[in-house]
Swiss-Prot record:
Protein name: MAM domain-containing glycosylphosphatidylinositol anchor protein 2
Tissue: Expressed predominantly in neuronal tissue. Expressed in brain.
UniProt domain Fibronectin type-III: residue ranges: 638-738
InterPro entries: Cell_Adh-Cytoskel_Orgn (IPR050958), ConA-like_dom_sf (IPR013320), FN3_dom (IPR003961), FN3_sf (IPR036116), Ig-like_dom (IPR007110), Ig-like_dom_sf (IPR036179), Ig-like_fold (IPR013783), Ig_I-set (IPR013098)
Function: May be involved in cell-cell interactions.
Organism: Rattus norvegicus (Rat)
Length: 949
């Protein structure tokens, strides 16, 4: 009966027609690595930790199943410090980081979703290992005097190295290894509140032999092949902390454009200190020139000003630091204001009253600032009626005042304030102020036609306030109705002519704007204000902006366009068009949407329908694409072993897909299949006929033949209906000729445990095995010799009993159907490594199971007994006629020293090399090389029943 079922299944596979089943499934995901990690722990921990050396290439692959094909997204968090996804994401199956750095360690998440069920998420923590060069610093202390002549001198040598994992330190004096307790004058300890980051060597009461060369060795125990690093320090009676001197003044005042040189020299320190320059804020200017302790700034500017510090360090004591402040002369922002007599409630200036003219600039350095006053070009000196003062710098820095007491007609004229710096080199700032009978305070008005001001979104608009008076002050614009920024991002904008120009007006800019006078360049009086209303009209915002409607012929469709917002909201009109053809017009009443129905679709009804909703500002448009195009096919990527190993130079591929929303349009009558070799331009096309209706989730299969090994191909699939072509889907198919499994990956290459056995095979590496493992049995490393590499083994310790079995099942491997009139069946070389060491070794068997046969297992290979502490390799030729599965069976021997292991299982097309095959058919060798012979009648039967291609 099993053989009959097997024949039925095989006939189904051989047919080049169409077959189907529901295959839609939510996503599953797992993360595999490239195998370049120096360690991966996943056995006794709740999380997977992938360890890699800094500078190596990280490569993680997210393997997904599910249909339709899930979308993949890689994200990262910083580890335990943060659970928030970072903004950067990778939308790719493989996450590859070349030359990984320490800050890139953390938890990496792979998220897969296809709209079915919940998204599938898996994570792996990446731990980046590194070891920086160690640094030795020296500190010394001198105790109190004893008996007037003796001083105790103690030296501390501190060794620090940044590392992951924690570093282990060791000390040497010359060639002598220093250990705690080995020398009474030496003490080695870790400071409190540290966790291995540093190790201190304390030399108590220095002795002559303590003056020597000391070495600190930092080690992470060769993890990830990171070598130890060493640093040395020569301790002598001349060892001293650094001291320096700056050969410049403090502060240094210079003019813009000048070159300045700062010189720093060492005056002490052993070993010779190194000198570096830093700036109190920010980085050093890019244009500087450094030469040892000399720093030169060519063509200095105000941006280069600040405090510059020279730091000397020789790792003895504390670094020495000297600083100087560079001041670059500058004069800017000259402005004035007129203050009327404060003892009268009148903002005008009048004969017989006091008037004050104030002048202000920003000066660096402020102590060099001087002012000069002129009237009509002639110098002014302070007198009883003309009082010149300078405001307290703490109250109003950089300000001078000219008080005119008892203003007379002869005082009218032009007053000039000139600001200059004593050091020179900077252009003076000159400010003219006219005092006359026409000098009056400002007044603000808004032209009648300028408020409210109506404009359309996207236009350029000018808001205007008319200012009168002499002199005309600066006008400040701001929002009056809400605390929001102005178009330039500031809270206030300045205008010298009273006009505010706004480019590309948006609807958010509607509202009230305030214009007010500033005290600068005008009268120092209560600000004058005026308001301008801005109304921004914008066309209707509608939904949907675009909607695709797929529907078959003779079916009904209703399109609806809805208004979300508009200004003005009334009166709104609408137009429905198909292309340029006007279908319907109308006006909105109380409803917020308009509809257009199509009762029965035909060829002339397909096309783009536009609904325009219109107001004074413009139109909003809903677009509807009504089409009978079929949706794109959905390629099925979860086919196990889709490559068929046909003949020597060609292969076949089982292409599978489902149809997205097959009932949305007319019945699909065929598919147009296009195929081309990767890198080529020409497509080869053929049609695949479809009989009957396709069901949602139905799996369709078509076998691609005569593909050249090992080329990849691009496949394009287009559904066809009576409407015409639908959307196409393209995928790349690749030849994968050899199966290889080293059991490094999380799901052990889809191997599974047999439910009918007594116990299970176990995945293990030497680095992760139980410390209480049984000695004198089992491997000390994987087949490649790596302590971190994984293999599968049977644990024969108690409670296992003699004769109990553990069975490991391979995934199912597909092969190509064969024709009895063509070449003979393809051969496959099946190979693996096995380890059988221990005095109680039992038996290792390998069986072949063909598709459809659940009870018949054909013995391929067998071995028993102790083979020594080494890995052995086995090769077996197999000639399957249908899909097959391999079974590894380990049988427990008479005692606990009977662990059996396997590693590096491979299946390659073609026979094994003759030198790899056993010389005779013994128990320890191949017992099923010709297992295909008894199946020859089946081949004949199948070949008769199946059509030839």
């Amino acid at each position: 009966m099993d053989l009959v079922y097997g024949l039925v299944w095989l006939l189904t596979v051989l047919l080049e027609g169409i077959s189907g089943q529901g295959v839609y499934a939510p996503p599953t995901v797992r993360i595999v690595h490239s195998g370049l990690a120096c360690n991966i722990e996943e056995e006794r921990y709740s999380e997977r930790v992938y360890t890699i050396r800094e500078g190596e290439t990280l490569e993680l692959t997210c393997l997904v199943t599910g249909h339709p094909r899930p979308q993949i997204r890689w994200t990262k968090t910083a580890g335990s410090a943060s659970d928030r996804f970072q903004d950067s994401s990778v939308f790719n199956e493989t996450l590859r980081i070349t030359s990984i750095q320490r800050h890139q360690g953390g938890r990496y998440y792979c998220k897969a979703e296809n709209g079915l069920g919940s998204p599938a998420i898996k994570s792996i923590r990446v731990d980046v290992y590194y070891l920086d060069d160690p640094v030795v610093t020296v500190h010394q202390s001198i105790g109190e005097a004893k008996e007037q002549f003796y001083y105790e001198r103690t030296v501390f040598l501190r060794c620090v190295a940044n590392s992951n994992p924690p570093v282990r330190y060791s000390w040497r004096r010359g060639q002598e290894v220093l250990l705690q307790g080995s020398d009474k004058g030496v003490e080695i300890y870790e400071p409190f509140f540290t966790q291995g980051e540093t190790k201190i060597l304390k030399l108590k009461n220095l002795r002559p032999q303590d003056y020597a060369n000391y070495s600190c060795i930092a080690s992470v125990r060769n993890v990830c092949n990171i070598p130890d690093k060493m640093v040395s320090f020569r301790l002598s009676n001349k060892t001293a902390s650094p001291s320096i001197k700056l050969l410049v003044d403090d502060p240094i005042v210079v003019n813009p454009g000048e070159a300045i040189t700062l010189v720093c020299v060492t005056t002490g320190g052993e070993p010779m200190p190194s000198l570096t320059w830093v700036r109190s804020f920010g980085t050093l200017p890019e244009k500087i020139v450094l030469n040892g302790g000399t720093l030169t700034i060519p063509a200095i500017t105000s941006d280069d000003a600040g405090t510059y510090s020279c730091i000397a360090n020789n790792n003895v004591g504390n670094p020495a630091k000297k600083s100087t402040n560079i001041i670059v002369r500058a004069l800017k922002k000259g402005r004035f204001w007129i203050t009327p007599d404060p003892y009268h409630k009148d903002d005008n200036i009048q004969i017989g009253r006091e008037v004050k003219i104030s002048c202000q600039v920003e000066a660096v350095p402020s102590e060099e600032l001087t002012f000069s006053w002129f009237k009509n070009g002639r110098p002014l000196r302070s007198s009883e009626r003309m009082v010149i003062t300078q405001t307290d710098p703490d109250v109003s820095p950089g300000t001078t005042n000219l008080d005119i007491i008892d203003l007379k007609f002869t005082d009218f004229g032009t007053y000039t304030c000139v600001a200059s710096l004593k050091g020179g080199g900077i252009s003076d700032i000159s400010i003219d102020v006219n005092i006359s009978s026409s000098t009056v305070p400002p007044n603000l008005t808004v032209p009648q036609e300028k408020s409210p001001l109506v404009t359309r979104e996207g236009d350029t608009i000018e808001l205007q306030c008319q200012v009168t008076g002499k002199p005309k002050p600066i006008i400040l614009w701001s929002r009056a109705d809400k605390e929001v920024a102005m178009p330039d991002g500031t809270m206030q904008m300045e205008s010298y002519d009273g006009t505010l120009r706004i480019v590309n007006v948006s609807r958010e800019m509607s509202g009230m704007y305030r214009c007010q006078t500033s005290q600068y360049n005008g009268f120092n009086v209560k600000p004058r204000e005026a308001l301008v209303q801005l109304i921004v009209q914008y066309p209707p915002a509608v939904e949907p902006a675009f909607l695709e409607i797929r529907q078959g012929q003779d079916r009904s469709v209703t399109m609806s366009c809805r208004v979300l917002r508009a200004y003005p909201i009334r009166v709104l009109t609408y137009e429905w068009r198909l292309g340029n053809k006007l279908l319907r017009t109308g006006q909105f009443d109380s409803q917020e949407y308009t509809e257009y129905p199509l009762k029965s679709l035909s060829n002339e009804n397909y096309g783009v329908y536009n609904c325009s909703i219109i107001n004074e500002a413009g139109a909003g448009r809903c677009s509807f694409l009504v089409t009978g195009k079929a949706y794109a096919p959905e390629f099925y990527y979860d086919t196990y072993n889709p490559v068929w190993q046909n003949r020597h130079r060609v292969y076949s591929y089982s292409l599978q897909w489902t149809q997205m929303n097959p009932d949305a349009v007319d019945r699909i009558v065929a598919y147009r299949l296009g195929i081309r070799q990767a890198g080529q331009q020409r497509w080869w096309e053929q049609e695949i006929k479809i009989n009957g209706n396709i069901q949602k989730g139905e799996l369709i299969t078509y076998n691609l033949t005569e593909l050249i090994k090992p080329e990849a191909y691009e496949v394009r699939l287009t559904p066809l209906t009576k409407f015409g072509e639908g959307d196409s889907t393209i995928r790349v198919i690749k030849y994968t000729g050899e199966f290889h499994c080293g059991f490094e990956d999380g799901n052990i290459c889809l191997f599974t445990q047999d439910d009918t056995d007594n116990f299970d095979w176990t995945k293990q590496s030497t680095a992760t095995r139980n410390t209480k493992y049984t000695p004198n049995t089992g491997p000390n490393a994987d087949r490649s010799g790596s302590k971190e590499g994984f293999y599968m083994y049977i644990e024969t310790s108690r409670p296992r009993l003699e004769g109990e079995k553990a069975r490991l099942l391979s995934p199912v491997f597909s092969i190509a159907p064969k024709n009895p009139y063509g070449p003979t069946n393809s051969a496959y070389c099946f190979s693996f490594f096995y380890h059988m060491y221990g005095q109680h070794i039992g038996v290792l068997n390998v069986y072949l199971r063909l598709k459809g046969q659940t009870t018949i297992e054909n013995p391929l290979w067998s071995s028993s007994g102790n083979k020594g502490q080494r890995w052995n390799e086995a090769h077996v030729n197999i000639y399957p006629i249908t899909s097959f599965q391999l079974i590894f069976e380990g049988i427990r021997g008479p005692g606990i020293e009977g662990d059996i292991a396997i590693d590096d299982v491979s299946i390659a097309e073609g026979e094994c090399a003759k030198q790899d095959l056993p010389t005779k058919n013994s128990v320890d060798g191949a017992v099923g090389i010709l297992v295909h012979i008894w199946l020859f009648p089946v081949i004949i039967l199948i070949s008769i029943l199946s059509p030839r291609r």
